[in-house]
Design a protein with these regions (language model features):
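Histidine-centered copper-binding motifs that mark active-site loops
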Residues: 1-291
Length: 291
């Protein structure tokens, strides 16, 4: 494909989605005060990343993207039964596109396949799963080792002691060799551990003044009419395995907005992208404030 043939898939398509239009979603909370067993179901669902996009087929925890935020006090053990009810194959088109620029953008930062051919092996991936609590001090038997797979219709039971200092962790799928695809498909959520030392700081706890933010980037396929289809696209070039996608997603929404009051907020960020880096800033009078 020549550059001119692919120009319609460049910055103009990215700009077709209006930023700061949709409200910031807040994942549902599961607040745990005593030793508990939870059941979290892995499900295939439809999810709309932006009001200007058609819904996308995704993989989720409990039908939410991101999955429910689990909040627990330090030292309170939690058992989680991860119930795999995923249907169908991987809901992401995986391509490697020829190495060239699209209107000045690296090819993987432009929407659409850009001449890349879908990976047939990735397209056939079934919904195997194993969940890992990233950053958790967890026994090996519950750590979500990459080959301890549960097939659709099966479950795993893991124990999390939560005996560690306050932190915002995240849980995600961890299948050997394809973690990048299954997390891209939606299998991720937040896990908050609280302790007395954190409580002494007097920081906001819970909504609306504590705002968890799971950052990610996503790309989408483009139809013959030049419009985004909503189909998730994982595109790389032949020389770079890492994926850098053009749309920034926060809590499952592209470029969302949150209305705030003139008071203290606690914004908690978790980086959930494959490789992209971010430089979060707070604007003051229209300019970045790095103080």
């Amino acid at each position: 494909m020549t550059r001119s043939a692919s120009a319609s898939n460049g910055p103009g398509v990215v700009r077709s989605l209006t930023p700061f239009l949709d409200p910031l979603p807040i994942p549902p909370r599961r607040v745990i005060a005593e030793p508990t067993r939870l059941t979290v179901r892995l499900q295939t669902a439809m999810h709309q990343y932006h009001s200007g996009l058609p819904p996308s087929r995704v993989w989720t925890y409990d039908g939410h993207l991101p999955g429910p935020t689990i909040e627990v006090r330090r030292g309170v053990p939690v058992e989680v039964q991860w119930d795999n009810r995923l249907e169908g194959t991987l809901p992401v088109t995986v391509v490697r596109a020829p190495r060239f620029e699209v209107d000045g953008l690296p090819v993987q930062c432009a929407p659409g396949r850009s001449g890349g051919v879908p990976d047939a092996d990735a397209a056939a991936l079934p919904g195997f799963s194993v969940t890992h609590l990233h950053g958790g001090l967890t026994h090996a038997t519950s750590d979500g080792w990459t080959e301890n797979l549960a097939l659709p219709g099966q479950s795993t039971l893991d124990t999390y002691p939560n005996d560690q200092r306050a932190a915002m962790l995240w849980y995600h799928d961890h299948v050997m060799g394809v973690t990048r695809f299954s997390v891209y498909a939606g299998l991720a959520g937040l896990w908050i551990v609280r302790d007395e030392r954190e409580q002494e700081l007097g920081l906001p706890e819970g909504p609306p003044y504590e705002v968890p933010l799971l950052l990610a980037d996503r790309n989408f396929d483009v139809g013959s009419d030049g419009r985004l289809t909503g189909e998730l696209l994982h595109k790389t070039d032949p020389e770079v395995m890492e994926c850098f996608s053009p749309f920034t997603v926060v809590n499952g929404a592209i470029w969302p907005v949150v209305e705030v009051e003139p008071t203290t907020y606690r914004f908690r960020l978790r980086h959930g992208s494959n490789a992209r880096t971010y430089r979060p800033v707070v604007p003051r009078d229209g300019e970045p404030d790095n103080q």
